[in-house]
Amino acid sequence: DCTRMFGACRRDSDCCPHLGCKPTSKYCAWDGTI
């Protein structure tokens, strides 16, 4: 299972593919990959 866009996270691996964890806001956002 993975965290979707704007879901809470602690690290990049928590997030779904093509999403990364924003360290300041602690949510998953697009990491720029396709």
From Swiss-Prot:
Its main location: secreted. Disulfide bonds join C2-C16, C9-C21, C15-C28. Keywords: Amidation, Disulfide bond, Ion channel impairing toxin, Knottin, Neurotoxin, Potassium channel impairing toxin, Secreted, Toxin, Voltage-gated potassium channel impairing toxin. Expressed by the venom gland. Transmembrane segments: none annotated. GO terms for cellular component: extracellular region. Coiled coil: none annotated. It is found in: Secreted. One of its GO terms (molecular function) is potassium channel regulator activity. The modification Isoleucine amide is found at I34. It comes from the Eukaryota. Negative results: does not have effect on Kv4.1/KCND1 and Kv4.3/KCND3. Intracerebroventricular injection into mice does not induce observable neurotoxicity symptoms. The presence of a 'disulfide through disulfide knot' structurally defines this protein as a knottin. Acts as a gating-modifier to inhibit voltage-gated potassium channels. It inhibits delayed Kv2.1/KCNB1 (IC(50) is 12.7 nM), Kv2.1/Kv9.3 (IC(50) is 7.2 nM) (KCNB1/KCNS3), Kv2.2/KCNB2 (IC(50) is 21.4 nM), and transient Kv4.2/KCND2 (IC(50) is 1.2 nM) channels. Belongs to the neurotoxin 10 (Hwtx-1) family. 57 (ScTx1) subfamily. This is Kappa-theraphotoxin-Sc1a.
